[in-house]
């Protein structure tokens, strides 16, 4: 008995569990699992719920295998008891009742844990005789079609489903099946007023068809006169369709309508838009529509596909990249990633994101890994991920996706349904009845019968055509099916051509064939028998049955060859310009949420009037039983969405309220026979639902553009009156209060240019206007729920939020029904207040404002709990689709987001956001350059019925209005523009600030030697103006750096900045470069004490000064004589004048000049155009044969005075010198000062260094030529008499400087290293004293050792001084100096004179020869004035410092004056005491000073020589060490080889002595080969 009792109990349990149903899913084979037990429907807890349990449930429901087993109330929370928990199926049970479980109602779960099921959708073939149902077996049509980017879009279209974007199916460019030819057409044609100036219609896909142009408010065609591939290429590019394949004329895609706007188009092929091509005036042509031009473009390549799944919307995700299909790794793969992929594929939302090669392992490369989508991207390519092809996965980790949509033409199987009209919530209290009917949505299971009910397949009415077009966008387009032997079957495409299509279209009353030759399978694979093959119509037959063909059922085809036909449309009606749009028919078809072809799309009758439902029950055929009472109470309050103005849409949509359900199946079937369609076939057909919905009660309202109403009927839909049956309850009422939104000129930024709908979902309550919207979603029917209250948008907390609340929100938004949510914050956290919490809708309210909830703003939530909502679709056809193809961005854009291809227009729907409001969450559409790439700059505002910039209230009559395009509040960030939106100005790139010149660099920047060098303006260069720049302040300013560059011009030449060396280029010209300008910058303000003016005599040749001039930044470039003034102007100007001040040099101040060593002044140098004068002080150094050296010399001038002192002074002096301007130079030079220091010696070769100093002066003085200074240095070299310097100036021509490198030779200058200051000087030196070897200006510093003189102070030009490497080569003359040889070793010396010139650039970095014209040297003459300053500045004093303190490399010695005619000037020309052309007192002429200078230079030369020797010795030691290392390496290598040989021998010996052990493993055998030493 106990056994019997157990068996009985088991049987009872099984019987109870046999009754299953799936509720609230996208179709009958997916949803929340509910079980009938104890007279009530209840749910199943997700504890222990997995794919094995789901597989048993799916099998029991007749829905094939299980794809996913989501928990967590994925399909919404159910009602009633939780019957089962902890199910533990093995997966092979026949019924869920056979699985072990915890017991009936034994659980610890809540409805938040309700389990769901996603089945493959394959129905067992027990409901019909044949197994040809589309549900049987094979994967869905076209889903696996392999399309290469070059092929047309897949022929099979995705099922346009209600997923958040009903239009997805048609708008996606995925490699997956595309909606037959029309998926794109409607997008291109709806919204004429939009900015998309071109569109293609009547073609096989969106990138082929008859070309139409929008102009004058109308669409018109293009005449084919002169139309060729070049014209087509421009049009294809403008449309975003790639290249042109063909340019057919002769109305190849059918004749158009309206005006012929363009004729005789003559594009060259490179134009940006068709309107830019030569053509006849608008509207003037000699053509008719039989000559309409067409296009066939390559079209965008497919990007995604789902392979090896049960249908096209489930499978392994594959991506097309690099010419191959590859898979996606499941690392980090989740529902958000799958949601993006499903949306891009046009398959709605994501139900599951299986990994682990759930759908089998792919082949080919793994294209993507670590995808991290947020869930609201429009395409997978916008999600963060590793670079293409980079991964760490194997194909066993291939990711898959299960979408809630079905491919076009796919009818999900319906599990047995319970016929009682109850919703899941209500069903709990009502036992199921025995009646059954097919329910597309939530499939109910009739308790007794466990197997699905078999429905008969309706055939055509008597006398009607025995054929039909299904799975297409309209009744006149789709897959051809023929009725025979009481069954519908397909036709094979063998031998099918336009003549056969013509017969079919004529028989169906659909006009003529519209497209040349629709590819087979374009409208999906059919099911059932293939009735006809090898049809051979002549084209004149009255019926397809009259055409010759193979015997019925005889064929050699498969369903992938099913014929598709597209006709122009009924001849009696205006053809629909976009016949391929899809209508959302909630109550039709077996899938309550299925998108069916828009055969409803018939031109609305003019007599259509607004009406309100008196009777709320709609007889939607096939609709699953649902209680209609929930919608009865508040229908009148239901706001409506207004359709956009679509000139091209000549049809309207008929719809019944989303939740209205059929009362009985019988009623549905009886009325369905009026037309020959098989509305009741198990798969959706193209038949207009109204045909069979005689009982459907619909509200008809005229569509007005931008109409807004706060009071409207329960639903605004349009329907051809002829299609309404007498049984429909329609009450004629005054037209709904629809009023167009305020008129704004279309071109104005505030006017919505897009006729997009502006649905109004505002209601007026006690608290004022109530608005709701969905933000940050892919379209207006999906996103984060936001509510307008108290002047602000806020969010809704998800506490207690359930399906009933969501249903009311979707209804209020006019977005149909609720789709399964994907996480509470699927659309991200919002901003602003959280207005509502604890919502408690019953589901029958017309607005959320009617539902009980907490007080406004009272909540215990944060934005992580914001409600996200995804509705099924749109309730008004005219509002569909909300996306349109934008040729500019080449993407589908939300209506109003951007105008297609029309530059210069602002977003039609841009509206101002409330001041202070956060910037709208922006979702980037494809190809937008915006950095906030993922958000749309707008959100759908239900009250206003248009997209608004996020954060802005809608322009409701009762609330703040926002004109489309109104400006944003000042503080709010601008909304992002989609790529195609050319209207709004682009954000300017952040301005790039020009690099600021280094403060310390002086001479280099002076590159503009020419100007400064120019003899003409020598004086001016030094004018007070330049002095101004020379002023310590100016110099000092970091600007002193190249900034001050323009010797002549205030700003240094960029070149100068970059190549300080240029300044030193030629001895005379040394400072001519812009560096002079730099010099000013160099002048350090700090250098307070002006260097004692060197004896005016120090000033070198005017010629040299001229060069200096070029150096001086301020230059005024002419610095020459003027330079002096400039220097004067500068506090240190006087110093600059120094050259005149030559006498000063002798004073210790001169040494001060040394400080000038440009080092400090370097900046000064920069400052100094004036600085140049500074060098003038140094003039003597300038004199130093090397102009380069001179530079230092200039500093040295002081040396003349007391070279050594100023060496010491160098730094400080330089600074004071800045007073002259040059002084700043000095400042820089400080390091240089040491010039005399050994450092320079290191540079020894750098006599050129001396040049450097010269350079410095050059800048300032230009004229001053620091030559004077140089002389000081020079003397040192050979030019014992600082006169040499003078000659140097001659040399100054500094051409030598150019040679500056030549200066290098000046090694004599080396001693000059003292000139190190030269760097500083450099600026001046160059300029200064060209005569006195102005060349010295050239910065030899870098010379000999390639080190820079301390003179770097010259920074810009003098820079070399800072870097010993900067060889400032003095002119060859310097080389003449006895000491030059010494310096020769140094790098600077290496350079030939010409090179010196390069070196001159003072900056070791810039070696380019900056040779200013020697003529400049004369210009330098003026510098004399500067001489005083420069003299002091240049004082070689630094030299002394240099040797002791500065590193030799830092301050390469200036060549001992290198007065030698480096540049070719002979020291003799002027004679040691020759005064510059403009009489200048040259300190160099004073024997005592010269003697001291020469002595100092020689000392430095000796030091440099010694240093060179040490360096050479070290180099040799390093070479020896390197050689030893090399030998050691060789030895080691030899040992290794030896070891290898020994091992091989040992191995051979081993093998010979012992037979190879059979047990030896390959690894063991190989080991000896690897052996280590």
From Swiss-Prot:
Pfam families: SRCR
Basic and acidic residues bias locations: 672-685, 924-934
Biased composition (Low complexity): 1161-1175, 1185-1277, 1381-1401
Covalent S-S links between cysteines: 45-109, 58-119, 89-99, 223-287, 236-297, 267-277, 329-393, 342-403, 373-383, 492-557, 505-567, 537-547, 797-861, 810-871, 841-851
Cellular component, GO, one term: membrane
Bias-annotated ranges (Polar residues): 431-440, 654-671, 687-702, 711-735, 1101-1140, 1335-1354, 1364-1380
Biased composition (Pro residues): 1004-1020, 1083-1093, 1144-1160, 1278-1328, 1464-1475
Tissue: Highly expressed in monocytes/macrophages and T-lymphocytes. Highly expressed in placenta and spleen, and also detected at lower levels in colon, and more weakly in lung, heart and kidney.
GO terms, biological process: defense response; defense response to Gram-negative bacterium; defense response to Gram-positive bacterium; detection of bacterial lipoprotein; innate immune response; negative regulation of interleukin-8 production
Signal peptide: 1-16
Alphabetical UniProt keywords: Cytoplasm, Developmental protein, Disulfide bond, Glycoprotein, Immunity, Innate immunity, Receptor, Repeat, Secreted, Signal
Positions bearing carbohydrate: 168, 376, 420
General function of this protein: Binds to extracellular matrix proteins. Binds to pathogen-associated molecular patterns (PAMPs) present on the cell walls of Gram-positive and Gram-negative bacteria and fungi, behaving as a pattern recognition receptor (PRR). Induces bacterial and fungal aggregation and subsequent inhibition of PAMP-induced cytokine release. Does not possess intrinsic bactericidal activity. May play a role in the innate defense and homeostasis of certain epithelial surfaces.
Subunit field text: Interacts with LGALS1 and laminin.
Protein name from the UniProt record: Soluble scavenger receptor cysteine-rich domain-containing protein SSC5D
Taxonomic lineage of the native organism: Eukaryota, Metazoa, Chordata, Craniata, Vertebrata
